[in-house]
Amino acid sequence: MFSLQDLCRKNIFFLPNDFSKHTLQWLGLYWKEHGSVHRAEKDSIMIQNELVLSINDALLLAGEEGDTDVVQLLLLWEGNLHYAIIGALKTEKYSLVCEYHSQIQDWHVLLPLIQDPETFEKCHDLSLECDFICLLQHAVKCDMLSILVKYKEDLLNVRIRHRIQSLFVLACENRRFEIIEWIGQNLPIPEPEAIFSIAIVTKDIELFSLGYKLIFDYMQRQGTFQLTNMVRMLLLNRYIGMAIEKGLLPFIVETLKYGGSVNRALSYAVIDNKRKIIDYLVRHENIPRGTIERLLHLAVKKQSSRKTLNLLLSYINYKVKNVKKLVEHVVDHNSTLVLKILLEKKENLVDAVLTRLVKHSTYFRVREFIQEFSISPEKFIKIAVREQKNVLIEAISEDIWENPTERITYLKQIVHTIKYESGRRFLIDIIHSIYQSYSLKHEDILKLAIFYVKYNAITHFKDLCKYLWLNRGTESKKLFLECLEIADEKEFPDIKSIVSEYINYLFTAGAITKEEII
């Protein structure tokens, strides 16, 4: 009969109007001082066919009244026992608590359901293995500020003051803003900066903003957290860096409100290639051109992405004013991507960079740059001649033209294009050193001799004449006559004097007549 009664009670969703109080009591569907009770829906009940309550609210009320029978009925209707126990604790109906005590494995589970601080503390006291700090921790988790207020003096006691930091961190992790503010206004927090790390990790801008309010409005004003201007700026810059690393623009904007450096924010954003942040700050903070160029230098130095470089260049319309500084960074940090971007926009800084490379860098760096930008040998050699880099010219020209005759031929052609005398002399000296290092064919030496005559290279020509006379003797007659004609035409007296000397040798040897000389 009992199981049938339970089955009826569990499944009755409608009570006939003619059920008497006695019948309802017999069925167990009567609540003392409230009237008939039955299920209205799966998770609610109806009292006296009028008042509708959720099953858990009804359990809370039944627990407060200590009505074990109604509690059993509501549990049959799938209510949560925790609410009955909370109600019983509130009104100290401990007999009901004792009856169900064994069914509760962890009393902490009930705490989030409790609104009343006194009941909250009573419930926590039932966890016999827990201490005072555990109570405070759960008060923070469950947003029970009144308990912290109650035990403020205990928290200030030297024995447990060190626990304030962990409670503060717990409040931050659980977003208990009211508790965070109260702690900031009433308790000494050893490391309040923890709020910023938590806010950034959880991407919680409200918590992040509260951190600044806490430090700069509450704690600093009260003297519990003193900051010099330098330390303040260091803190702000640190949080800017953390926010940029995560790409959190609202956090950066919030930091700028408290005196954070927009230039530092832009620098971090450039290094981390955070283009949306860069674009927002440049447009909203009216960043001047000079600052943008400095950011461009930083981007080159840190080898930022193509998109970041493009963005920065777009702000200055791809026109760089401080070319010298940009070139220095390109060379010093071997960062050439910006040159390629500028080339695409018809802005050529390759020559300027090549000049600095030739002047200050190694053979390997120069060769790599020449290959990367497909620079013509003539352009490189002219720059190297201007910078007087003979070893560099010799090494790279040997890479380009392995055959010494071919090398001399091309270098001679470049001499023709050099417009200043000292440059021509410098390159002719290099050509002569190549001649001295290799054994050239006779016809190539003859061509070189004529070349020397045309450019009045007296010493080198004299050297060749000596070689030709010793090794070819009178066979060089035709060359000497041709050189004499050129020297007359160009009015090179020193060359003419050298040639005349060897023509006299030819005449003495009977290899030439007066008529041929005339």
From Swiss-Prot:
One Pfam family per UniProt: DUF249
Keywords: ANK repeat, Repeat
Family: Belongs to the asfivirus MGF 505 family.
Repeat positions for ANK: 54-83, 129-158, 261-290, 292-322, 324-351
UniProt keyword Ubl conjugation present: no
Domain of life, per lineage: Viruses
The keyword Disulfide bond belongs to this UniProt entry's keyword annotation: no
Known role: Plays a role in virus cell tropism, and may be required for efficient virus replication in macrophages.
Cleaved signal peptide residues: none
Protein name from the UniProt record: Protein MGF 505-6R
